[in-house]
Amino acid sequence: MSRNSSLQALVLSVRPFGEDNRIVKFLSKEKGIFDAVLYGGPKSKLRAYVSPYHFGNLWIYTDETKHSIKITDFEVIKYHPEIRDNLFKTWCASFCSELVIKTDACGEYEKIWTLANGFLDGISVSSEDECRIAFLRFIWRYIGIMGLQCDTESCLHCGENLTNSKGKIYFSILENGFICENCFNQSNDSFFELSSEAIIFLQAVTLLSPKEARSIPLHFSTTQQLHEFLTFLINRYTGCKLKTLEMSSGIL
């Protein structure tokens, strides 16, 4: 059985298939992550429309017998041209795409659909400095959808409120949780040290609306702390090395 259908989709990646064709990986709320074949050479108008990070209305022809999907048309709603004009924004979008693909959107297609599209929309209209903070929010929210966010409010050992802690705050890699200075074992060499500002930021991203969370400023040193911490976590939780993170030297 074969059928024509339409849906809204985000282009995650495009790769060559044969001499003139391409295999396109999409994300949609209805179908999740799926591949579709785009036929046509370099001069194809449709080929120009179906490019990474474009979002729009997609028409497909599904051949159930051959287990294949063919792209018949694509109406772009959002091009995100600003992403291609900035190296850091391009890197952020590439990271987003790789993470979504390698985790199969955590099986939470509608939630990741909203998060990924919101992230790409946001970095398109933001400054590079704003993008660096948006990148941190994106990872922490993604970890939340994975169901792996640890408690940022209380010490793992004594229950002290970390927001009001006047001492240092540590994340124990072995115990996978935050520990106050009084409970921290100095012999533990597998940890991240975070400022109270970093903890408050993570709490805000979890509890506040995206608009409210965007208004929270960060010092440069805190941004660096969180980048090192969150990229470690996402690599750990995905169970694989993300190539975009490995290639980030010179970009960040």
Regions found by a protein language model. Give the residues of each.
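Non-catalytic alpha-helical scaffolds and adjoining flexible linkers that form interface surfaces
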Residues: 1-23, 27-252
